[in-house]
Each structure stands twice: as structure tokens, then as C-alpha cells.
């Protein structure tokens, strides 16, 4: 194989061996095939041999692969691929910038454990340092987060104004309760996108999460203002035990009933999950019956699927790999004038994870390191039910018992 760009992998079928079994990742058709080691070895043996040298059984196996749309000449082992793929110098594409830890709400699951008692703020000068470093890294998308960024008032406006011509995309993540007409005009002027958190279509259920009465109506009114002004916005929700999402009763937003089940970070903990949600969260055989996520596979070849393309800058300019991951950091921008990211953090993919590095599914399995029940950085996801050491899936009831 010659040098190929990581974005030009769509015609390949990647062969990944595990401890007992193997997987074929058919990127063109977005399909995954779980096979035994015997077939894996046979594929590696015959893929470059003329059929005249093969046995009838071997020819029949090749024909079966062809019938499933797999061309033997397109199969490449993960080891071969890693030797041939050329990477662009820049990997980080997005940065969260935490401008404060103060929040006017008290959300029960807050990954940042923010509240009105938290008083950390990023100074304007430090923000300038962060922007300079991000520009040097060719980062083109940023998101202002908190806490609640809008509690900063004019200070946040000054930061946004300064950054407005330096990035392709700027978004503010907010609970929406402080958005008024003045903020909407400001967002419109500087082409700022807005992400908002809403937890239910029912005001009382939403406020079970935020712990502040009246917060639902304020957020909903903010969304109405944003839409009226044609501001680009999106609504995010986290799914938790005992929080009834309710029935859709507005055309302002749509809440997910499946994605983003609460993670074990910050105030997020097992007490916010019931058996039904844990079952939804489990990685089971059915997880791989859906079309393959090619972006996850491509990023996981060399990098952690998140840490390789995103960073999180805290108020004191410490740089973490994720908004939820503070067990380790890349260092501090302020303390290092020649700041560089830690390559080992960016490349913390499933090849380095206990219980995953010998798993044939590791290339197509999305990894969220912060979503952990232990302090161990390299622990296997607690919600995974596959046992690569024996090549079998754990019974769901056994998984539930283990987690409890």
C-alpha cells in the first residue's frame, strides 16, 4: 500500500483481530462482520494469491465474501493501514472555553458541578492568550461555556467581540434564562450560534433538574426570541431517572428520548439512572447491527475519538481533553509560552484501554473516557457487555447485576 489520506478510506475493508475472534469493517457499505480467527487468517493468506493456487473451500469462502459486497483486494489489516495512512498536521478542530464556573441554576447532573457559589472567572487577558494559542493551532470552532456564560454580562460581550473575526464558528452554551432582547441583538450582530439545555416539555419536570422555579418559562421565552430573530440555535437534553420528558407540545425544539443518557462525571452518578436507562446505555451485540460510524472509525485508528480533535480550556487556562475530563491535562497555556498538546492524551484510544485493547470491536466502539465509575483512566467502559477474552457477550441480566 502507498500513502493514503485518512479521508480516503471509504473503499477499504479493515480487518481487526481480537483475542479470540476478528471483525471486518466494511466502510463502503457501513457494515460490520464478526468472524472467527480461522477466516481472518485465511483472508490474510489468500488475498494476494491467484485463485488457481487455492483450494475449492478457499474459493467458496472468497465467493461468499464477494456475495456480501466485499472485494478481497480491498481488505487491509489495521496494522497495514496504520503504516500507510498520512495524517494532516492539525487535528484539533474545536475548543470549549470555560469563561466562568458560576451558574444561576443548580442542575442535579451538572458535569462541571457549577452553582452560584462557584466564583472562578477567566480574565480578559487570559482569554486573549487562549485565543492566540487556538489560532496558532488552527482551531476554527469554539464554544463559550460555564457555569452560565451570560452571568458575565458585558465581559462576555467583550470576549465575543474580540473573537468574532478569528473563528469560523462561535457558539454560546447557555441555560437561556438570562437571554433578553439585548443579548439576541448582540448574537445577531456577531453571527453567534446558541446551544441551550432543556430537559422536558413539562415545566415542573425541567425544574426538577434545574432546581429553580420559573426557569423553564424563561428558557422557552429565550428560544422564542432567538427564533424570531433567526438566530441559529439548537437544544440539548440529558436523559435521567425520574425526569419525564413528556409529549412534544411545541415547535420550538425537539428533545431526544434516546441519546445522551447522563454520564458519570461531575454530579452525574448512578443514582440518576434506573435499570431501563442502564439497559439503553449498555454496549450489546445490537449496538453493532446499526450502520458503522465512519468518522469514529477513522479517528480511532490513531486517536481517541474525542481527545484527538477537541480540547477544553478552564478559567485558569489549564487545558483538559474534554469538558467532563479533569483527571489529567495537557498543561497550562499561561505557564507555557510555547504550549503544546500532550500526544499521549490525544492518542488514548481503545488500543490502550484495559479490556478493550484485545477486542475486535475496538475500532468501531465510541469511547467516552470521563463516563467512568472508577478513577482509573484506562478502565474498560462499565456499560460494555462484550468479553473479548472468551469472544462472547455477557448476558444483560449479568451486566445489570455487575453494575449494581
Language-model segment annotations:
Residues 1-45:
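Acidic, low-complexity/disordered tracts enriched in E/D and polar residues
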Residues 2-4, 12-17, 188-320, 324-330:
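Radical SAM enzyme [4Fe-4S]-AdoMet core and its adjacent flexible, acidic
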Residues 42, 46-57:
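Short acidic, hydrophobic short linear motifs in intrinsically disordered regions
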Residues 56-57, 64, 68-185, 189-193:
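Conserved alpha-helical substructure of the radical SAM core
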Residues 56-79, 301-303, 307-342:
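A broadly conserved sequence feature marking short terminus-proximal activation segments
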Residues 96, 100, 104, 303, ...:
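Residues immediately within or flanking Cys/His clusters that coordinate Zn2+
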Residues 114-118, 207-214, 374-375:
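Short glycine-enriched, charge-decorated loop/helix-capping segments at active-site entrances
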Residues 324-404:
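Flexible mid-to-C-terminal extensions adjoining Fe-S/redox cofactors in radical SAM and related proteins
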Amino acid at each position: 500500500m502507498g500513502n493514503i489520506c485518512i479521508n480516503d478510506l471509504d473503499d477499504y475493508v479493515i480487518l481487526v483481530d481480537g483475542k479470540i475472534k476478528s471483525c471486518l469493517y466494511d466502510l463502503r457499505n457501513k457494515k460490520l462482520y464478526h468472524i472467527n480467527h480461522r477466516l481472518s487468517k485465511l483472508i490474510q493468506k489468500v488475498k494476494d494469491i491467484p485463485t488457481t493456487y487455492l483450494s475449492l473451500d478457499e474459493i467458496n469462502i472468497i465467493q461468499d465474501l464477494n456475495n456480501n459486497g466485499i472485494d478481497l483486494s480491498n481488505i487491509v489489516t489495521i496494522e497495514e493501514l496504520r503504516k500507510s495512512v498520512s495524517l494532516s498536521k492539525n487535528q484539533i478542530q474545536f475548543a470549549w472555553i470555560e469563561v466562568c464556573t458560576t451558574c444561576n441554576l443548580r442542575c442535579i447532573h451538572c458535569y462541571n458541578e457549577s452553582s452560584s457559589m462557584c466564583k472562578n472567572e477567566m480574565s480578559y487577558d487570559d482569554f486573549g492568550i487562549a485565543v492566540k494559542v487556538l489560532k496558532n493551532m488552527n482551531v476554527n470552532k469554539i464554544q463559550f461555556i460555564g457555569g452560565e456564560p451570560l452571568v458575565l454580562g458585558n465581559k462576555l460581550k467583550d470576549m465575543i467581540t474580540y473573537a468574532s473575526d478569528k473563528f469560523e464558528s462561535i457558539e454560546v452554551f447557555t441555560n437561556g434564562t438570562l437571554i433578553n432582547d439585548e443579548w439576541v441583538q448582540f448574537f445577531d450582530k456577531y453571527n453567534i450560534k446558541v446551544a441551550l439545555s432543556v430537559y422536558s416539555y413539562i415545566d415542573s419536570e425541567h425544574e426538577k433538574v434545574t432546581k429553580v422555579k420559573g426557569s423553564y418559562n424563561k428558557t422557552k421565552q429565550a428560544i422564542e426570541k432567538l427564533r424570531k430573530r433567526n438566530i441559529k440555535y439548537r437544544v440539548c437534553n440529558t436523559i435521567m431517572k425520574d425526569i419525564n420528558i413528556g409529549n412534544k407540545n411545541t415547535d420550538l425544539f425537539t428533545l431526544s428520548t434516546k441519546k445522551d443518557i447522563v454520564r458519570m462525571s461531575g454530579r452525574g452518578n448512578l443514582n440518576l439512572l434506573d435499570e431501563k436507562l442502564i439497559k439503553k446505555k449498555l454496549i450489546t451485540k445490537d449496538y453493532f447491527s446499526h450502520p458503522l460510524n465512519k468518522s469514529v472509525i477513522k479517528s480511532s485508528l490513531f486517536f481517541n475519538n474525542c481527545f484527538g480533535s477537541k480540547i477544553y480550556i478552564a478559567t485558569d487556562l489549564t487545558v483538559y481533553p474534554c469538558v467532563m475530563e479533569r483527571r489529567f491535562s495537557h498543561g497550562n497555556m499561561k505557564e507555557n509560552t510555547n504550549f503544546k498538546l500532550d500526544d499521549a492524551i490525544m492518542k488514548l484510544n481503545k488500543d490502550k484501554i484495559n479490556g478493550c485493547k484485545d477486542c475486535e470491536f475496538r475500532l468501531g466502539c465510541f469511547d467516552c473516557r470521563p463516563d467512568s465509575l472508577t478513577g482509573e483512566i484506562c478502565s474498560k467502559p462499565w456499560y460494555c457487555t462484550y468479553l473479548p477474552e472468551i469472544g462472547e457477550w455477557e448476558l444483560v441480566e449479568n451486566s445489570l447485576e455487575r453494575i449494581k
